[in-house]
A protein has these predicted regions:
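C-terminal accessory/binding modules appended to enzymatic or scaffolding proteins
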Residues: 235-268
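A short, compositionally biased
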Residues: 38-41, 230-237, 275-277
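FNR/FR-type flavoprotein reductase catalytic core
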Residues: 82-243, 249
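Ferredoxin-reductase
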Residues: 2-93, 110, 144-146
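Iron-sulfur (Fe-S) cluster-binding segments and ferredoxin-like electron-carrier domains
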Residues: 259-263, 268, 277-322
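Short, surface-exposed secondary-structure boundary micro-motifs
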Residues: 48, 99-100, 284
Length: 322
């Protein structure tokens, strides 16, 4: 389940796109075409030190000869964004995965409403380019705290479809420049909402949409970062490895991944925050305590899979298909 297809690419260009944000243009080594992708796709990037991180593709999905990603340098980086900014340079060869898409455009739709906060513009920009090429009806709203921190702002304003895009800069008032209530009410049948950005931005958009009675099937979103949630009432529980019968106790301070590693069972991870889905594992028996932002509510309710990087157990034991 966790194995991926990888390929080698060359960093053709690295440039600053905004304050604290750089982009990488990735080309195939042999000059041939790259695996096709659709708007909303992301790739895993293998970084120095054994780190693996996910970055969305921002270029037009009809471009078969390159991938473009943009990376925000996070002040609280666990090594990923710092490695991109400090260690990767034009001319280097790196390993990436083939593209995957958990944030695809819904078709057919009467209209597409695209909302991006900060670095969340990367998959949203690819969507806008795709929709514009198809002459589809869409609006793009791009929110940021300061103009100099908004990647691709100039490119958006210079695009042939710039009339469908609005930039909302918060710096003047200190409050959000976008009136979410006015934008999302009333809900319109056939309109699909796509949102990507920091968790606070995502929560504000989705909470407003749900309060306005947007149907879940018209809401599409992708988180860029989460937090492994530890609660004061977390208790120990057991995890059994189905293939070997090994049992390990997971303490309140540990994640399931960490506990499994202590007995020599390695689960492939990437974000380690319940966002990317890399560590998705089948649950044979027991009831998970889902704390991820990857599975849908319906998938969580089924209790037949979970993300061991962040989720825990409500039952005394989980038996995992490992």
């Amino acid at each position: 389940m966790n194995h991926e297809n990888t390929l080698e690419v060359r960093i053709a260009c690295k440039q600053d796109e905004a304050q604290g944000i750089c982009s990488l243009e990735l080309l195939p080594l042999d000059g041939q075409t790259l695996p096709v992708f659709s708007a909303g796709s992301h790739i895993d990037v293998h970084l120095p030190g054994g780190l693996v991180r996910q970055y969305s593709l921002s270029n037009d999905c009809t471009e078969a000869d390159r991938y473009v990603i943009a990376v925000l340098r996070e002040p609280a980086s666990r090594g990923g964004s710092a490695a991109v900014h400090e260690q990767l340079q034009a001319g280097q060869q790196i390993t990436i995965s083939t593209p995957r898409n958990h944030f695809a455009l819904h078709r057919p739709a009467q209209k597409h409403l695209l909302l991006a906060g900060g670095i969340g513009i990367t998959p949203i920009l690819a969507m806008a380019r795709d929709l514009a090429r198809e002459s589809a009806d869409f609006e793009l709203h791009y929110c940021g705290r300061a103009r100099e921190r908004m990647a691709f702002a100039d490119a958006i304003e210079a695009a042939p479809w710039a009339g469908k895009a609005q930039l909302h800069v918060d710096e003047a008032s200190g409050k959000s420049a976008l009136d979410l209530g006015a934008l999302l009410q009333p809900v319109q049948p056939g309109v699909h909402l796509y949102v990507c950005g920091p968790k606070g931005f995502m929560d504000a958009v989705l909470d407003t949409a749900r309060a306005a009675s947007w149907p879940q099937e018209q809401l599409h979103y992708e988180f860029f970062a989460g937090e492994v949630e530890h609660r004061a009432d977390d208790e120990s529980f057991e995890v059994e490895v189905a293939s070997t019968g090994q049992i390990v106790r997971v303490t309140p301070e540990q994640t399931v991944v960490q506990a499994l590693e202590s007995i020599g069972v390695c689960v492939q991870t990437s974000c380690e925050q319940g966002v990317c889905g890399t560590c998705l594992t089948r649950v044979i028996s027991g009831q998970p305590d889902h704390r991820d932002m990857y599975l849908t509510e319906e998938e969580q309710a089924a209790n037949d899979q979970f993300l061991p990087c962040c989720s825990r157990a409500r039952s005394a034991r989980l038996v995992l298909e490992l």
